[in-house]
């Protein structure tokens, strides 16, 4: 009698099926690579889906120029080791305007450097499908998003104009200029992600592991001192409050907009144990999620991931 699939193997099989469906159904797909743990799992699944061949689509990083330095080093290392075709896009208009999260705030920085940057890249290369690592358990607007998330010709998401998804049947029909955002990890939880990383020994950015790091508390959020740019925007009193703490990150984004959590979880088993006990969302440290009520849904309506 054949062994029953474990919970993680079922999730793995579902995700691989979705990835293969997209590769077969669309003319020009791309995998968005944000360098975080979910991207690491999604990339691992994609490589499994087409092993021993190479990925039949490129990976793309929409770079805000404000990621953690360790993230950039990790990205370059993975691309070299895996032989990936990497596209990196930075919004030139944002660079020309000197957009940054300190002077312009999280909402404007995210809109110009992430949302507009993504739309520029999708238009430039003519991608008709884009894989993303979002999960339904992360945030309420993502909880109601389809696996195949339809976007109009301006990349906008209308939650009231989405297609039914029955069982594992997905409708990828689009007109010229329209596209689909595809979320193969929709049914995974944060705990599933960590258990899978542990079982498959997937490399991840070291920032996920607890270590002594320099941080400053701003509005209740622990912000890591990642490079000298942040010091230009701190007062003398704030600089005096910089201290070293044992912290790690549950989610990774632009470093001035991503809060660390105090933790001693320095190994994968430690992190899994911590996940079994925690009762807070991993996105509690994302400053952009607190821009206003329904801020994530509004960002997605404008074309955000």
From Swiss-Prot:
It catalyses: sulfate + ATP + H(+) = adenosine 5'-phosphosulfate + diphosphate. The keyword Transport does not apply. GO terms for molecular function: ATP binding; sulfate adenylyltransferase (ATP) activity. Pathway: Sulfur metabolism; hydrogen sulfide biosynthesis; sulfite from sulfate: step 1/3. Keywords: ATP-binding, Nucleotide-binding, Nucleotidyltransferase, Transferase. With CysN forms the ATP sulfurylase (ATPS) that catalyzes the adenylation of sulfate producing adenosine 5'-phosphosulfate (APS) and diphosphate, the first enzymatic step in sulfur assimilation pathway. APS synthesis involves the formation of a high-energy phosphoric-sulfuric acid anhydride bond driven by GTP hydrolysis by CysN coupled to ATP hydrolysis by CysD. Heterodimer composed of CysD, the smaller subunit, and CysN. Belongs to the PAPS reductase family. CysD subfamily. This is Sulfate adenylyltransferase subunit 2.
